[in-house]
Amino acid sequence: MITRRGVLAGGISAAASAAYGQAPLSSLVPMPRPTAPTPAGAAGLENLIAASPYQGAVAAVVADARTGEILQGHNASANLPPASTMKVLTTLYALDALGAGYRFATRVLATGNLRNGRLEGDLWLYGEGDPHLDTTGLAMLVTGLRDIGLREVTGALHLVDTSLPSIPLIDATQADYAGYNPAISGLNLNFNRVYLAWEQGTNGLQVGLDARADDLRPAVLGIGLTVADRAAPILDYRAETATAREGWSVARSALTGEGGRWLPVRNTAAYVGEVFASLARSSGIVLSRVQRATAVPSEAVVLSEISSTPLDGMLRSMLRYSTNLTAEVVGLRATQTLTGAANPSLRQSADHMAARLDGRYVSGRAELHDHSGLQDLSQMTPVQMVQALVAAGPRGRLRNLLRAHRVNDEVQAQIGTAEIVTKTGTLNFVSTLTGYIEGPNRPLAFAIFNADLPRRAALGPEERDRPPGGRTWIGRARTLQNDMLVSWLRGFG
């Protein structure tokens, strides 16, 4: 049951685009009053949309953030992809399940006997899925081993990544080289990306892969890399089924001057193991073998351990930088905690999140396929998004995690001193915006979904990086969104 007053009710009629008074979201059937005049200063949404060069679907709603009273809407019950505004729902889901202080641990454990710096036994690297673990974090674990005097391991380093299901990617429709479409595992490193760097040296082109973080640059040799004399494709990914070894081929024509880019890693355990072993060797610790394992023996003893930042800080970073890996990891961990399921798929986990939110934060079960919003199969209504914002409250923990809305000087002059905090979402021909407006009179909660799904579906694989007309379309969508914010602030805030 949702207890926050004014929350929940069905949507607004798709045709209701003029401003009107309406019963709060908590009523079973919204009762629009189309004859209510548009408040002074607020423009009718139909007029704003008609005056805009933007082309595509628009679904938008604004409500009183304290009572849930819907103040204005347009196609507000239309189901469209929320894109990365989905992370607002994931934030609420994870905080409810795990708590703001939850931390992910990464441990190095040992079985056997440690004598005079020599471990006659095995090491076990166990991860709880920390999405922020980077090479610096691994180096801290190695330092912990060195500080207790470890110098040699006679057995193997076992990699245990089974605390989360191993998922090779979030969205199968994305390009192989999309760094925002990473693998998910119980052992994640550098957001499951490896850095491709190149420069023109005295002996010609120098190219390589590394796991850089801060001032560390451990080379990564376990992922194949070749340079090919071709014009296209610039990047080509291959994975060997038998060995799970992955590799990249790069077009020489693209490697001009000095540069670099992050590439996704699919076999995350092998990547983590190689980097950890490299750091250990650099610290004088001899490791002979690295292999995967499914569990840590019960008799293993912790030798070194690090913990992630608390969940609320992790979520603040996720909402600011829209990190998909963080969203999927915290969503999966929340589902594991609530259901006891050890290996839910992304679809199963997202579906459980939708069921959990229904009746607590939203009215009706949204169609969710992930926790990040990367898949356009995930769809919901802007009314549902606003319901979640109202339920969370304009002074609640979600409000404090969202970032200030960034606008140009012209829009800022119209907003004045009002505070607007938002989460944005962007896919090809999808642009979404949701958040709170803190005006002089009352706080508002809003959601705006813009999409041209037929145009998105028509893109060929070679067009997805730079879709024809995509930049212009996004610019027009964002201008329309800002026009709505200014209108709502003037009329209702």
Sequence positions of predicted segments:
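N-terminal export signals
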Residues: 1-24
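Active-site-proximal beta-strand/loop segments in catalytic clefts of secreted hydrolases
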Residues: 63-65, 126-129, 160-162, 253, ...
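Residue-level preference for non-acidic, small/hydrophobic
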Residues: 68, 87-94, 157, 187, ...
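Short glycine/serine- and small hydrophobic-enriched flexible loop segments
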Residues: 93-99, 332, 387-393
